């Protein structure tokens, strides 16, 4: 359990250093993806406000999908990932396939994020090569992920806060 900002030691000797506010802001910040800033403008200009309807439909779909997954985790708390459910109900081969395709998908998503960051930075610093920006950001993110969990959570908390403030500012100035 997470209690405020205190670290809790688990029965296996590990320590949970992320507080409830860290976990909540990591979840909120994770839902506000780069595509919202980079790709939404082009999509909205091409399709108009109907894209909001599509976002709502997809959001509703994923809401129910994650509710169902949450029910499965509640029913069987020994399973730690969706891959364990796939392995149990569809077999070892399907579970292995799902695990590897998920890993490859995350790898591609990370590379897309690095490309988006270099696009943003090159807007302000056009002379900087994209590969240098991407390697620098990758190194910074690696260092951030190698730090203590509490520092990682605090950094992610403030990055998510910046995203939320940026979205609210864009909506307010757009009105």
Swiss-Prot record:
The keyword GTP-binding does not apply. It is found in: Cell membrane. InterPro entries: AA-permease/SLC12A_dom, Amino_acid_permease_CS. The chain crosses the membrane at residues 25-45, 46-66, 97-117, 124-144, 155-175. GO terms for biological process: amino acid transport; transmembrane transport. Keywords: Amino-acid transport, Cell membrane, Membrane, Transmembrane, Transmembrane helix, Transport. GO terms for cellular component: plasma membrane. The keyword Transmembrane helix applies. It holds the Pfam family AA_permease. It is a multi-pass membrane protein. Belongs to the amino acid-polyamine-organocation (APC) superfamily. This is Uncharacterized transporter in pepV 3'region. It comes from Lactobacillus delbrueckii subsp. lactis.
């Amino acid at each position: 359990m997470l209690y405020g900002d205190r670290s809790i030691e688990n029965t296996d000797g590990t320590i949970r250093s992320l507080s409830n506010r860290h976990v909540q802001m990591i979840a909120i910040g994770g839902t506000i993806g780069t595509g919202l800033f980079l790709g939404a403008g082009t999509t909205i200009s091409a399709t108009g406000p109907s894209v909001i309807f599509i976002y709502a439909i997809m959001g509703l779909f994923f809401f129910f999908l994650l509710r169902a997954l949450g029910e499965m985790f509640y029913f069987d708390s020994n399973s730690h990932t969706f891959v364990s459910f796939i392995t149990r109900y569809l077999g070892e081969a399907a579970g292995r396939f799902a695990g590897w395709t998920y890993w490859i998908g995350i790898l591609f998503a990370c590379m897309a994020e690095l490309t988006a960051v270099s696009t943003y930075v090159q807007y302000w610093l056009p002379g900087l090569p994209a590969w240098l920006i991407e390697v620098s950001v990758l190194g910074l993110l690696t260092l951030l992920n190698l730090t203590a969990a509490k520092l990682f959570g605090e950094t992610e908390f403030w990055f998510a806060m910046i995203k939320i403030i940026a979205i609210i500012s864009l909506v307010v100035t757009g009105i």
